[in-house]
Amino acid sequence: MNPPFFIGPLAPGFRVPPGDTAALSTNKIIYDLLFAENKVDTPTIGFVDVRDVAIGLVKGQKTPGKHRIVFGGEWFTLGEAVDYIASIHPELKGRLATASPTTQKKSLLDNSKAALVLDLTPRSWKESVRNGIDDLLKLEKSWVL
């Protein structure tokens, strides 16, 4: 499988030293949306939920034949992600980054082979962002304790 950025929830028991945001890998893109001083100007993000990658890799090992599968989730703008985070966590509104307006948003990936060969359909970007943000907020609280 050749996915784009991985986002979503952290692995159970995943520990990160306080403030070590580099350990978040590509989830840092989502974490950075939690800081008002950040100006987000990346128009779109191609992503896949980390859980879908894991499922795809396991199913791929069990599928006969050799396949090269490109797989990714629906694309979204980081401005949409900021707005969505504000809607599910209204207490964060004053804390969130600002995003440049953009209309550029189009997934260039065709997931039909993943659906056919692996019976795999990507999760929505909202589910991945919600689960990722929730875990990142829990992690952040553990840094303060």
Descriptions of predicted regions:
Residues 15-48:
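A conserved pocket-lining segment of Rossmann-fold NAD(P)-dependent short-chain dehydrogenase/reductase
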Residues 43-47, 54-101, 111, 125, ...:
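Mid/C-terminal beta-alpha module of Rossmann-like enzyme folds, strongest
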Residues 91, 119-120:
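Helix N-cap/coil-helix junction residues
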